[in-house]
Curated annotation (Swiss-Prot):
Family listed: Belongs to the LZTFL1 family.
Region (Interaction with BSS9): 145-299
Subunit structure, interactors included: Self-associates. Interacts with BBS9; the interaction mediates the association of LZTL1 with the BBsome complex and regulates BBSome ciliary trafficking.
Disulfide topology: none
GO cellular component: cilium; cytoplasm; cytosol; manchette
Organism name: Rattus norvegicus
Stated name of the protein: Leucine zipper transcription factor-like protein 1
Keyword field: Coiled coil, Cytoplasm
GO biological process, one term: flagellated sperm motility
Amino acid sequence: MAELGLNEHHQNEVINYMRFARSKRGLRLKTVDSCFQDLKESRLVEETFTIDEVSEVLNGLQAVVHSEVESELINTAHTNVLLLRQLFSQAEKWYLKLQTDVSELENRELLEQVAEFEKAEFASSNKKPIIDITKPKLVPINEGGTTELLNKEILRLQQENEKLKSRLKTIETQAVNALDEKSKLERVLQDLQLDQGNQQDFIKAQDLDDLENTVAALKSEFQKTLNDKTENQKSLEENLAAAKHDLLRVQEQLSMAEKELEKKFQQTAAYRNMKEILTKKNDQIKDLRKRLAKYESED
């Protein structure tokens, strides 16, 4: 259909609609003609009429014709709505959204093209068109194999999208929980380190008290020896030197004990488990962040 730019199938659909419209128009014109014929047969029986009688006849005819024309216009509008509804229903089954340009309905050039097409199409027959009662309806396109596959694919994609959204939400929840658990573990580790420091401080304080008591005792003994001016001064000096050596040895032992305590604490199962848990949680957080970045890039 070169004039309207439609393919053969759509051309046949347009011709069928034109045939239907011409038939309805012909029936309505017959009705209008019958109004005038009824008026002639029922009212125009006198040879002369007064002005009032003529006005009454014309007013009655006007009312009848007005009613018939109005009824036809309303019916035509409703018919066009039903036709659009059929087309839109088919489009929606393909997940399409059609648009109409109402301003084109008053395009004189296009209207003339349609008139020429109608004239050329129906010029070969002088008979008035007859409504094709057996005219087939629009076939629902969802019965075809292609449409069924398309609908299934759309449904599958929608379901997959919902699954991805749910999975992303689950991953986000896991990430938040992992961060919370990491924070808790860090606080526990800090508490353990603080307890360790307190224990070391307690041990240091206790050893220092012992050393101070020992030194004080030695000083007291040395002072007593000096005051007594006994002949054991040399022995006392040796004892003092030995005490100093003992002090250094005790200090060294204290340092070694501190290192040993720290080493033993690091070798304890609680410390190793805590360190292993923190390492695993850090790895999980890194993995979750990578996965979140991957899903964000896909969206």
